[in-house]
A protein has these predicted regions:
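Acidic/histidine-rich catalytic neighborhood of metal-dependent amide-processing enzymes
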Residues: 1-47, 137-140
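Active-site-adjacent substrate-binding region
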Residues: 42-122, 126, 132-137
Length: 140
């Protein structure tokens, strides 16, 4: 999405998928000058982040949460009350529209020369995506 979402728009129009899962980073808020009361509480090393909000198809979001719980996958929830600014937003509104979900890796100091992520979070995301690919999703 950093370059105008050209790739996701082209892919969505060409493939016309039933579902789309955007994978991105999100701001970790576990550093000294950040207020969790103002910015929410997202921690590096505490698991993959599952977004909830208007860009997220509710059934797909619930399925991801259920799979994380059933398989002991570490996760965090990030409420997003507006369009996400990620590929999930562009998939949702391109062409006929696509049911979307968003998984994010917590990133401390995003958009600086010293970004920090945890392989724990990356691996939890890989596990969740693997389980998601193994289940039948209802396309109603």
């Amino acid at each position: 999405e950093e370059l105008g979402a050209l790739g996701v728009r082209t892919a969505t129009l060409s493939i016309e998928p039933d579902f789309g899962i955007a994978i991105d980073v999100t701001h970790a808020t576990d550093y000294p000058t950040c207020s969790p009361q103002k910015s929410g509480e997202i921690k590096v090393g505490a698991g993959i982040v599952i977004a909830k909000g208007p860009n997220i198809e509710p059934n797909l979001g619930r399925r991801m949460l259920d799979l994380a719980k059933q398989n002991d996958i570490k996760y965090q929830i990030e409420p997003i009350a507006r369009p996400t600014g990620t590929d999930a937003n562009f998939m949702q509104v391109t062409g006929r529209g696509v049911k979307t979900a968003l998984l994010s890796i917590p990133c401390r100091y995003m958009h600086t020369p010293n970004e920090i992520v945890s392989l724990v979070d990356v691996n939890e995301g890989v596990k969740l995506l693997t389980y998601l690919c193994d289940v039948e999703l209802d396309n109603k």
